[in-house]
From Swiss-Prot:
Residues 1-28 form the signal peptide. The lineage of its organism: Bacteria, Bacillati, Bacillota, Bacilli, Bacillales. It comes from Staphylococcus aureus (strain N315). Belongs to the CHIPS/FLIPr family. The keyword Transmembrane helix does not apply. This is FPRL1 inhibitory protein.
Amino acid sequence: MKKNITKTIIASTVIAAGLLTQTNDAKAFFSYEWKGLEIAKNLADQAKKDDERIDKLMKESDKNLTPYKAETVNDLYLIVKKLSQGDVKKAVVRIKDGGPRDYYTFDLTRPLEENRKNIKVVKNGEIDSIYWD
């Protein structure tokens, strides 16, 4: 009888250790998945805010019959991305009265780099023309 109790205790310990290990793995996996969901949600929220902001800028320009204006390079990128149609990979935007630095080139197949997002656009930011490639 003593052997059976010892075997039962050892088996219970092994099973408990296995369950504990599985539980920790499940917690780690769940935590990892949860972080991924939070990141995806934040990106979706940011995209929605950007889209609403660009819609507002474009509607205001359409209402006043003025060229589209952008304050930052990110605004310019989002306007170009919204206006692009079909299989457009690159766009070159020319700013009105911008001088020698009046061209901005965007690769529309990738998101805009973080270090370019908050750069101010030259002059008043009015778009003179857009060349699609």
